[in-house]
């Protein structure tokens, strides 16, 4: 996600009512390092969650495409870097549906990685923890969404193991 310039953010803030502006700033206070990216999400991308999810998925795909797979050490390091960025974007959204969608996509990309993650116990443990986290998050959703995401999780991940 490319952060907007300070001028663009300032221009967008002029159009917000004071109550909304105050809520944005209070939420911003929780994040110290990535304030600019969070404001970009809140002002420009929060209204269209689907396109936000797709842009984050494309960044995950780019990260996986650039992984150095010659050494499992570098592969593990790259995967952890991608995952930490993904967690940051999930935190910006704060929606469980977004979290489930992005983590399923990340796990799916881990499954299709070459060389396979089954060669590294550390990567398998990371994968298992992520799948467990997805399942736990699915349980927190509404019943309809819970069923839909459970079916999607089963079809996209369990078949590939």
What do these predicted ranges mean?
Residues 27, 31, 55, 59, ...:
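Charged, amphipathic alpha-helical oligomerization/scaffolding segments
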Residues 50-90:
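Aromatic-anchored, charged helix-turn/loop surface patch used as a conserved interaction hotspot
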Residues 101-161:
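Glycine-rich, aromatic-bearing surface loops/beta-hairpins
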């Amino acid at each position: 996600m490319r952060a907007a310039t300070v001028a663009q953010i300032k221009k967008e803030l002029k159009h917000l009512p004071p109550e909304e502006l105050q809520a944005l700033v209070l939420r911003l206070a929780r994040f110290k390092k990535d304030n600019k990216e969070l404001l970009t999400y809140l002002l420009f991308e929060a209204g269209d969650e689907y396109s936000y999810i797709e842009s984050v998925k494309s960044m995950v795909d780019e990260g996986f495409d650039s992984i150095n797979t010659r050494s499992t050490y570098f592969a593990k390091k790259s995967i952890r870097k991608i995952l930490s960025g993904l967690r940051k974007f999930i935190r910006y959204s704060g929606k469980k549906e977004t979290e489930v969608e992005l983590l399923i996509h990340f796990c799916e990309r881990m499954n299709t990685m070459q060389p396979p993650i089954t060669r590294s116990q550390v990567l398998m443990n990371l994968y298992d923890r992520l799948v467990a986290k997805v399942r736990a998050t699915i349980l927190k959703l509404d019943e309809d969404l819970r069923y839909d995401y459970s079916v999607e999780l089963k079809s996209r991940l369990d078949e590939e193991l």
